[in-house]
Amino acid sequence: MTKSELIEVIAGKQQHLAHKDVELAVKTLLEQMSETLASGERIEIRGFGSFSLHHRPPRIGRNPKTGEPVALPGKYVPHFKPGKELRDRVNAGRHNPIQS
């Protein structure tokens, strides 16, 4: 699901809200989450999951074109850990794996 699809679904379910207001709310929510993670804080949404930063240490990579070693600096990457309720809901009734 894309951001625009999410906005459409919410606007369809909450018809008393203007489409523009739903779009603003979704964009504001995502911007605030991005700012919070960028400042190093953790985000916890009970029943859904938590977002945090994980540190990737510096390492030696390889240039795929030349094969030469390249020093890659350490960095932080966003990480999502689903909550129990979300895991249970996703797995409820799933007996076969999702086919790609």
Swiss-Prot record:
GO terms for biological process, alphabetical: DNA recombination; regulation of DNA-templated transcription; regulation of translation
Gene Ontology CC entries for this record: chromosome; cytosol
Biased composition (Basic and acidic residues): 82-91
Region (Disordered) location: 53-100
Spans traversing the lipid bilayer: none
InterPro entries, per the entry: Hist_DNA-bd, Histone-like_DNA-bd_CS, IHF-like_DNA-bd_dom_sf, IHF_beta
One GO MF term attached to the UniProt entry: structural constituent of chromatin
Keyword Transcription (UniProt): yes
Keywords linked to the UniProt accession: DNA recombination, DNA-binding, Transcription, Transcription regulation, Translation regulation
Source domain of life: Bacteria
CDD domains: IHF_B
Pfam families: Bac_DNA_binding (PF00216)
NCBIfam families given in the database record: hip, PRK00199.1
Role of this protein: This protein is one of the two subunits of integration host factor, a specific DNA-binding protein that functions in genetic recombination as well as in transcriptional and translational control.
Family: Belongs to the bacterial histone-like protein family.
Oligomer status and interactors: Heterodimer of an alpha and a beta chain.
Name this polypeptide is given: Integration host factor subunit beta
Gene behind this protein: ihfB
